[in-house]
């Protein structure tokens, strides 16, 4: 009987020691103080990562040792919190729903990022400094971009030039295949190409292609009445930091026209588009000299953020339009700020 009691006590003691050890191991793990995007947290939870009751990532061995994550097709709009993975080197973020992609949300040691299928991205943050001289994400050795990254003429080209020998940059084509990134862009329509080449030769590397890293030196306006539905190429001119002048582009109302990415540079004083859709919206954040805004018959336009400068300046003597802000025929417009 005495032996049985001793054996029972030994079992209880062992169980207590093991339990205490497990609790100690769990309590030893730190929690991330970085705020996680709710959808990203849900995705990571389904992948087996642990979060506290307060939504903080528990930095256990699984987190500390994770070097690769496949977060493709997860409908993510943000990766806030992902920098909590200290060993993460490779992340697949293809086919999500980003509109802004912030490289500051990635771990400092990140090496490879895949973004194919995220054609809604209009802004790339914290990849390189705003003046294009300092790379902020120096650890990258492989950057895979979505097709619509070709419209980005400030951040991506500057990063590409600065990291040519250190980072392989590729970009998806229209069919979803990755091809080597280049700063040269073709202008498909011969009539438009001829007009741009004649008025802005400083950015052409041949009669067919524009180099988006070159700065416009001509003082010409961009005024074009299109006879073709293909306006690809005007985006590279109106967003060029060297452009100074007016932009007035019109299409025939009976035809369908589209400008994929509209981001007027700081030198644009008048911006007018008529009978042209802008499926990725209009980014006027850089248009610090804008005095006149006119948008007519743009069925895809949902939001217009009007720079304060256009609301404060008196341009009654110089305006070529009846009013400083004129927006009409935009059936999808949700708000004008």
Regions found by a protein language model. Name each.
Residues 97-126, 295-314, 319-323, 328:
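Long amphipathic alpha-helical scaffold regions
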Residues 70-71, 92-94, 114-116, 248, ...:
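Short beta-strand elements of solenoid repeat domains
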């Amino acid at each position: 009987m005495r032996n049985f009691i001793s054996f029972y006590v030994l079992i209880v003691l062992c169980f207590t020691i093991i339990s205490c050890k497990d609790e100690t191991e769990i309590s030893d793990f730190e929690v991330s103080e970085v705020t996680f995007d709710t959808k990203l947290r849900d995705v990571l939870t389904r992948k087996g990562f642990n979060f506290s009751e307060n939504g903080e990532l528990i930095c256990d061995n699984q987190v500390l040792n994770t070097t690769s994550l496949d977060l493709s097709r997860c409908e993510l709009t943000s990766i806030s919190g992902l920098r909590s993975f200290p060993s993460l080197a490779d992340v697949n973020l293809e086919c999500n729903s980003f509109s802004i992609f912030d490289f500051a949300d990635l771990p400092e040691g990140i090496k490879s990022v895949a973004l194919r299928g995220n054609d809604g991205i209009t802004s790339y943050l914290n990849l390189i400094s705003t003046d294009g001289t300092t790379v902020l994400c120096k650890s990258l050795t492989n950057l895979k971009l979505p097709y619509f990254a070709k419209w980005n003429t400030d951040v991506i080209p500057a990063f590409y030039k600065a990291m040519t020998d250190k980072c392989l940059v590729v970009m998806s084509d229209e069919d979803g295949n990755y091809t080597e990134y280049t700063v040269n862009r073709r202008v498909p329509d011969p009539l438009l190409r001829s007009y741009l080449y004649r008025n802005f030769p400083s950015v052409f590397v041949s009669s067919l292609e524009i180099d988006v890293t070159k700065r416009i030196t001509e003082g010409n306006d961009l005024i074009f009445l299109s006879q073709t539905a293909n306006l690809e190429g005007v985006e590279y001119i109106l967003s060029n930091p060297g452009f100074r002048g007016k932009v007035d582009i019109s299409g025939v109302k009976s035809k369908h026209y589209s400008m994929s990415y509209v981001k007027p540079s700081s030198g644009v004083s008048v911006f007018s588009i008529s009978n042209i859709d802008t499926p990725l919206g209009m980014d006027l954040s850089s248009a610090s000299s804008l005095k006149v805004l006119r948008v007519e018959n743009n069925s895809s336009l949902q939001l217009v953020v009007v720079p304060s400068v256009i609301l404060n300046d008196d341009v009654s003597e110089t305006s070529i339009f009846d009013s400083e802000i004129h927006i009409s025929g935009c059936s999808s417009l949700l708000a004008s700020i």
